[in-house]
Regions:
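Glycine/small-residue-rich phosphate/adenosyl-binding loop
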Residues: 42-111
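Short alpha-helical segments used as structural interaction elements across diverse proteins
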Residues: 7-8, 38, 58
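Specificity-determining recognition surfaces
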Residues: 1-27
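Short helix-to-loop capping/linker segments positioned immediately adjacent to catalytic or ligand/cofactor-binding
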Residues: 18, 37-38
Length: 115
């Protein structure tokens, strides 16, 4: 697929067909692609956790997500939970933040990788 077409056809999915299942291999491919996203000073602070079991999916959906997002993931066959290692991206080796954004750099990088 041509890159411009990929960009133009990108969508935020908010309704899932419970009959359609994503395979573990497809999930691995998505996470592998995200890992190649650039990060602040190549700090690579993104972490990915995949929720495949229905019991854990429901627990995360009902106990961890805001109501709007909990409703949006109904019917999805998996959740990919993303997190960032704190106090690394946006920080110098001395442990001091590079600027006022501090941990914001890691969150920013994670958002870009998730796209």
């Amino acid at each position: 697929m041509e890159f411009q077409k990929v960009i133009e056809s990108r969508r935020s999915i908010r309704k899932y067909d419970a009959e359609k299942k994503v395979s573990e291999e497809q999930i691995r491919e998505m996470i592998q692609a995200a890992i190649y996203a650039p990060s602040w000073k190549n700090s690579q602070t993104a972490r990915y956790y995949c929720v495949l079991s229905q019991d854990m999916f429901e627990k995360v959906r009902t106990e961890c997500l805001p109501e709007f997002n909990a409703n949006n993931v109904e019917g999805a066959s998996a959740l990919i939970v993303t997190a960032v290692v704190k106090n690394r991206s946006g920080y110098e080796r001395s442990g001091e933040p590079t600027n006022e954004l501090g941990n914001g750099w890691g969150v920013y990088d994670l958002g870009l990788a998730n796209e």
